[in-house]
């Protein structure tokens, strides 16, 4: 920056607002490139050398045949599906597995961890189902 441009900047009303934005003016975490990471290095001769390992690679899935749209309008009506309850979740996920094991004859009350259940809730901060356990 030249001397004349610095002097001209000083005469302008609001000279502090006209100052060049540098890392000295921003917070401690301010980086001049606004969050973009460098993709290479600058040599002593001020030449930029890109480094392939520093360039991010994006893995984009194949969306061929994908039916959902990328945008959902705010004008869409509210959903009609009821909110998920623990009983509904149990009936949809765990109950069919237990019923299948009973039909096959391999169900055991000692092996409830197989279905994602816990034998006791000792040591838990919150008792999830207090009706099922003696107080």
From Swiss-Prot:
One of its GO terms (molecular function) is structural constituent of ribosome. GO terms for biological process: apoptotic process; translation. It is found in: Mitochondrion. It holds the Pfam family MRP-L27. One of its GO terms (cellular component) is mitochondrial large ribosomal subunit. The keyword Nucleotide-binding does not apply. InterPro entries: Ribosomal_mL41. It comes from the Eukaryota. Residues 1-13 form a transit peptide. Keywords: Apoptosis, Cell cycle, Mitochondrion, Ribonucleoprotein, Ribosomal protein, Transit peptide. Belongs to the mitochondrion-specific ribosomal protein mL41 family. Component of the mitochondrial ribosome large subunit. Also involved in apoptosis and cell cycle. Component of the mitochondrial ribosome large subunit (39S) which comprises a 16S rRNA and about 50 distinct proteins. This is Large ribosomal subunit protein mL41. It comes from Danio rerio. The gene is mrpl41.
